[in-house]
């Protein structure tokens, strides 16, 4: 497995594995169950400039594919793209595959997320 150029820009946490051409968010431990992985930008994105009172503007594009690790078992949960205070960036161990890798108890500072939820919770 070679180093992909994306690793110059992002860091993996949890069960992330980097393969040339893609990032597998749950593939590092080869266990598709109860697995959570996260990548984050190496450089902090400032959303507000307090000196100029200006908000930041940015664009992002990516493609995603949520596929089963085992052909007869459908993928569960999904993934989320989110903006978060760097102090809250640790992958919570107690989540064990649920919650789309989002932080616990972030209500005091808040965060913005777009979820791609693939699991119907009854």
Range-by-range predicted roles:
Residues 1-122:
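Polar, low-complexity loop segments and adjacent catalytic/binding residues used for recognizing
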């Amino acid at each position: 497995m070679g180093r992909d150029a994306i690793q110059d820009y992002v860091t993996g946490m949890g069960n992330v594995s980097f393969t040339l051409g893609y990032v597998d968010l749950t593939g590092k431990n080869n266990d598709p169950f109860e697995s959570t992985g996260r990548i984050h930008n190496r450089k902090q994105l400032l959303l507000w400039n307090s000196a100029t009172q200006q908000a930041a503007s940015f664009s992002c594009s990516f493609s995603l594919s949520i596929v089963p690790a085992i052909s007869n078992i459908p993928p569960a949960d999904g993934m989320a793209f989110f903006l978060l205070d760097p102090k809250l960036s640790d992958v919570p161990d107690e989540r064990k595959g649920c919650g789309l890798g989002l932080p616990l108890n972030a209500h005091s500072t808040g965060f913005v997320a777009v979820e791609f939820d693939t699991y119907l919770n009854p």
